[in-house]
Swiss-Prot record:
Its EC number is 2.3.1.275. It catalyses: an acyl phosphate + sn-glycerol 3-phosphate = a 1-acyl-sn-glycero-3-phosphate + phosphate. InterPro entries: G3P_acylTferase_PlsY. This is Glycerol-3-phosphate acyltransferase. GO terms for molecular function: acyl-phosphate glycerol-3-phosphate acyltransferase activity. Keywords: Cell inner membrane, Cell membrane, Lipid biosynthesis, Lipid metabolism, Membrane, Phospholipid biosynthesis, Phospholipid metabolism, Transferase, Transmembrane, Transmembrane helix. It comes from Francisella tularensis subsp. holarctica (strain OSU18). Its main location: membrane. One of its GO terms (biological process) is phospholipid biosynthetic process. Pathway: Lipid metabolism; phospholipid metabolism. It is a multi-pass membrane protein. It is found in: Cell inner membrane. Catalyzes the transfer of an acyl group from acyl-phosphate (acyl-PO(4)) to glycerol-3-phosphate (G3P) to form lysophosphatidic acid (LPA). This enzyme utilizes acyl-phosphate as fatty acyl donor, but not acyl-CoA or acyl-ACP. It comes from the Bacteria.
Length: 204
């Protein structure tokens, strides 16, 4: 691995480690998302704490954290494997941020950014899958999980297995981070879209 590739991966991880939920709440003098609600520093908890506008800001930044480094890797290296690894490092930064004690969000919004950066088709697959599952089931968490798996595995059909591997790892990590959501889905206790927010049901 040359210095450029190494630098891009480190940049992706460090950018991913900037937790927008925590920063947005700090700037607007709101309680830390790590100490209220679900305790998850992600968009859903910011929505609960600060409302739709601040949640939208958080969501946009989380998406950009995945999009920007992947686009940079794609343009500067022209190497699909390095670009896919860059996506993985951005997700690792978001979920295990060095700046916040390695305790971050669940990675779904950042994954959306990496998918669109890698291939707009993959990003579109994620969005369409999410919408279809959400309309049918009204479960935001289930929509995110199904979209994550389908979009990540779709890389296999557009690239070789080496390039797909980082995205498959991402899917596994995100599934593990949603273990609580999966348990509630199985037990029928997961909240649906439009239900009154429940502190433990964050999907992002």
């Amino acid at each position: 691995m040359n210095f450029l590739n190494f630098s891009i991966l480190i940049f992706a991880y460090l950018l991913g480690s900037i937790n927008s939920a925590i920063i947005v709440c700090y700037i607007f003098r709101l309680p830390s998302p790590r100490s209220v609600g679900s305790g998850n520093p992600g968009t859903t908890n910011v929505l609960r704490i600060g409302g739709k506008v601040l949640a939208a800001i958080t969501l946009i930044f989380d998406i950009l954290k995945g999009l920007v480094p992947v686009v940079i890797a794609k343009v500067l290296t022209g190497n699909d494997f390095i670009t896919a690894c860059t996506a993985l490092y951005a997700i690792l930064g978001h979920i295990f941020p060095i700046f916040f004690g390695f305790k971050g969000g669940k990675g779904v919004a950042t994954l959306i950014g990496t998918l669109f950066g890698f291939s707009w088709i993959l990003g579109l697959i994620f969005v369409i899958t999410w919408l279809c599952v959400a309309i049918i089931t009204r479960y935001s968490s289930l929509s995110a999980l199904v979209a994550t798996v389908i979009a990540s595995f779709s890389v296999i059909f557009t690239s070789d297995l080496q390039v797909a591997a980082p995205f498959l790892i991402i899917a596994i990590i995100i599934l593990v981070k949603h273990k609580g959501n999966i348990q509630r889905l199985i037990s029928g206790q997961e909240s649906k879209i439009g239900d009154k927010a429940k502190a433990k049901n964050d999907s992002n």
